[in-house]
């Protein structure tokens, strides 16, 4: 099953995340199928490609709760 979820990037103490499509069994920092945007909790910056998310949802991917919140509220 495909999941739309966050992948942590950045250094220690300065988190930053990419919104990616991955298989549900893949590790958090594993290989992503597609990048859909990013989220920086320090600067509160969030950019998400909503068109690509709609395409992936129509193909059967599921969003995690955090990505769902970012998709509805922040982007």
Curated annotation (Swiss-Prot):
<dbReference type="InterPro" id="IPR023803">
    <property type="entry name" value="Ribosomal_bS16_dom_sf"/>
</dbReference>
<keyword id="KW-0150">Chloroplast</keyword>
<dbReference type="GO" id="GO:0009507">
    <property type="term" value="C:chloroplast"/>
</dbReference>
<dbReference type="GO" id="GO:0005739">
    <property type="term" value="C:mitochondrion"/>
</dbReference>
<keyword id="KW-0687">Ribonucleoprotein</keyword>
<dbReference type="GO" id="GO:0015935">
    <property type="term" value="C:small ribosomal subunit"/>
</dbReference>
<dbReference type="InterPro" id="IPR020592">
    <property type="entry name" value="Ribosomal_bS16_CS"/>
</dbReference>
<protein>
    <recommendedName>
        <fullName>Small ribosomal subunit protein bS16c</fullName>
    </recommendedName>
</protein>
<dbReference type="GO" id="GO:0003735">
    <property type="term" value="F:structural constituent of ribosome"/>
</dbReference>
<keyword id="KW-0689">Ribosomal protein</keyword>
<comment type="similarity">
    <text>Belongs to the bacterial ribosomal protein bS16 family.</text>
</comment>
<dbReference type="Pfam" id="PF00886">
    <property type="entry name" value="Ribosomal_S16"/>
</dbReference>
<dbReference type="InterPro" id="IPR000307">
    <property type="entry name" value="Ribosomal_bS16"/>
</dbReference>
<dbReference type="GO" id="GO:0032543">
    <property type="term" value="P:mitochondrial translation"/>
</dbReference>
<keyword id="KW-0934">Plastid</keyword>
């Amino acid at each position: 099953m495909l999941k739309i979820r966050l992948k942590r990037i950045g250094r220690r103490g300065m988190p930053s995340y990419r919104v990616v499509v991955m298989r549900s069994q893949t590790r958090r920092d594993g290989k992503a199928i597609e990048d859909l945007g990013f989220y920086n909790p320090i600067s509160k910056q969030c950019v998400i490609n909503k068109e690509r998310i709609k395409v992936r949802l129509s193909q059967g991917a599921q969003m995690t709760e955090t990505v769902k919140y970012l998709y509805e509220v922040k982007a």
